[in-house]
Amino acid sequence: ETGKQYAVHCRKKGSLDANEEVILDENELAKGQKYFRIGILSVSPNHKLLAYSTDTNGSEAYVIRIKTLETGELLPDEISNSSYSFAWANDNKTFFYDQLDDAQRPYKALKHILGTSVNQDPTVYEEKDARFFLEIYKSRSEKLIFVSVESERASEVRFVDADHPKGEFTLIRPRENDLLYSVDHHGDRFFIVTNENAKNFKVVETPVASPDKEHWKDYLPYDPEVKVDAVDAFENHLVISERRNGLPAIRICDLKSGETHEINFDEPTYEVSLDRNPVFKTGIVRIDYSSFITPNSVIDYDMVSRRKELKKEAPVLGGYKKSDYASERVFAKADDGVEIPISLFYKKGFRKDGTAPLLLTGYGAYGISTDANFSSSTISLVDRGFVFAIAHIRGGGELGRTWYEDGKLLKKKNTFTDFVSCTQYLIDQKYAAPKRVAILGGSAGGLLMGAVMNMRPDLFTSVIAAVPFVDVLNTMSDPSLPLTVTEYEEWGNPQDPKYFDYMASYSPYDNIEENQYPNLLVTAGLNDPRVSYWEPAKWVAKQRKLKHQNRILLLKTNMGAGHGGDSGRFDQLKEVAMEYAFAIDTLHASSRPESAKQLLGR
């Protein structure tokens, strides 16, 4: 709502014309808190109870509460130290939830019955291998509850009948090294996305009654050029989330005819994903879409008629016109000849003459894809003459599993050299001025910032590193820290000399030299469970010891937040404003937005 920092969650009964009922006002819960974030938000099957969880310091250890929606009363049941997963059984009194271990890994699934002591909750599954994270979820069909555990290299999924929560969980397939799978339910069968004999994953099916591997069979032909990310089952259709040619894609499969088709999107670069879509018996799938130019949009897609209906496009203040802006996709050549996609955004009238300031971002880790989405904050930059760009470097998932694997472990340096190649390409092609390049990355993207700054300090004018993972060797040598053991399969285990030596060769903290480095803005969160605050602090301290006086070097520590920074939307905007002001100031860019007419020189 206008003027409020946090969301207000509402519902209407039966029709959008019905009266609106507020089920949870985050602003009320956040009063008196410096930090506030909702984790789970789940209404019981009979619509009478609301389970929600809160984090009030940024540590990502949530407290679960149950609210009676008819009266607003909070039940006495209260569960601490939970993560992000939860599922109601269909009896409306039993639910399953996770717990964190000392390293803040969700490792245990428990069952609670309302009105009973939390201390007596039985454990339904405990994952003892520290490489695996646990997740609990309920099928869209509302028939089954799943407990899934997954590492970087293996998966294992169990299920129980949601109508009979006292039952035992059934294992679908035991874990195997280098075998990943995820599951959705439809009637008497499971649809499974797996990489078994399919590097970029495929869709298989198996009977619920006998789900073991002997009964797995391909449902759709495997296409090695397409990365399958997820499958969502509806009554008469499968919705398959994919990546094609480096871009997100959605494919629809008619379960009766077997016919498939893609949903088409026209822009050269964009972001698209499925909305929550809780209803199983429907022919409509709701999609979230945006691009550099198109604001966040909610689209209903009719899977039978193949028609799109725009339900809502987020309003943009300040007289925003899509026609004033342009985006494109270009490719830079890496050191080994591989072509790296770059998404570009600028104002129409932009002159490709090598004088523009550039803000280039990147991530390149965990197989996560960084797609072009809408940000009114980014509009403020390009209105000042900036080119904004995303480098889709190896280590991310944009171009499939191999793209990811070629940027991890003993190939991690590809991520860094790819980013350098993208920067040099944009300068050579005159998208940017040689001395007006700012780069931005957070967390594992902050590692990227530190590594490329060491490799090519001459290439960048300014660096913005948000909660950066920069003390790689030290952090990965301490198994008591959150994420260390689970991420051996991402970075390697430094107890092995080959991984120790390789990490030592790129870890930003360990490779600082007495050099003329770029201007640097670093942020940290005191309660950050993923990148401890001391990592960026000691990185900055070491640089200050060797600092040249004609360079700006700033560290801002948020004393009341964690990995994601401030929680309120206005406070988040202030953080972005600080980062962008740093880029504008250090690149000597215009402090005032320019009109398209000014950019065109008329």
Residue spans of the language-model regions?
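Cap/lid segment of the alpha/beta-hydrolase catalytic domain
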Residues: 23-44, 52-61, 70-75, 266, ...
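A flexible loop/linker signature enriched in serine peptidases of the S9 family
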Residues: 1-7, 30-35, 54-63, 78-82, ...
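Core domains of intracellular innate-immunity/apoptotic signalosomes
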Residues: 66-90, 114
